[in-house]
Amino acid sequence: VHWSEVELHEITTTWKSIDKHSLGAKALARMFIVYPWTTRYFGNLKEFTACSYGVKEHAKKVTGALGVAVTHLGDVKSQFTDLSKKHAEELHVDVESFKLLAKCFVVELGILLKDKFAPQTQAIWEKYFGVVVDAISKEYH
């Protein structure tokens, strides 16, 4: 994947400046509301809101992985090999769920960034999440 200087700047500076865990919790909660069948992977959770403990804890894991992708934009796939295997072989998460969560992250970024979330910015973040979804899906057969 080729990243332009504008794309690299947008992703790295925005990621540094935002409350990633809050963003992640809101994106997960949105996914659970809009796509309720995705809750099936979280049988241990009792609540599916952005302020619930379980959602916040999973958001930390998700945003931690997204942070790894931000710092390794030139080689996201190799960074996600183990995570992809875990989700494919142990957790049996449907690849489509990653795409749904990515959409929810983009929506939450738009809400957070408001006027700074121009169409070009949205396109950058959709590209980033597309790369991440591709990377976490690579071990699926």
UniProtKB/Swiss-Prot annotation:
CDD domains: Hb-beta-like (cd08925). It comes from the Eukaryota. GO terms for cellular component: blood microparticle; haptoglobin-hemoglobin complex; hemoglobin complex. The keyword Iron applies. InterPro entries: Globin, Globin-like_sf, Globin/Proto, Hemoglobin_b, Hemoglobin_oxygen_transport. Pfam families: Globin. Heme b binds at H58, H87. One of its GO terms (molecular function) is metal ion binding. Keywords: Heme, Iron, Metal-binding, Oxygen transport, Transport. Residues 2-141 form the Globin domain. The keyword Metal-binding applies. Belongs to the globin family. PANTHER family: HEMOGLOBIN FAMILY MEMBER, HEMOGLOBIN SUBUNIT EPSILON. Heterotetramer of two alpha chains and two beta chains. Involved in oxygen transport from the lung to the various peripheral tissues. This is Hemoglobin subunit beta. It comes from Heterodontus portusjacksoni.
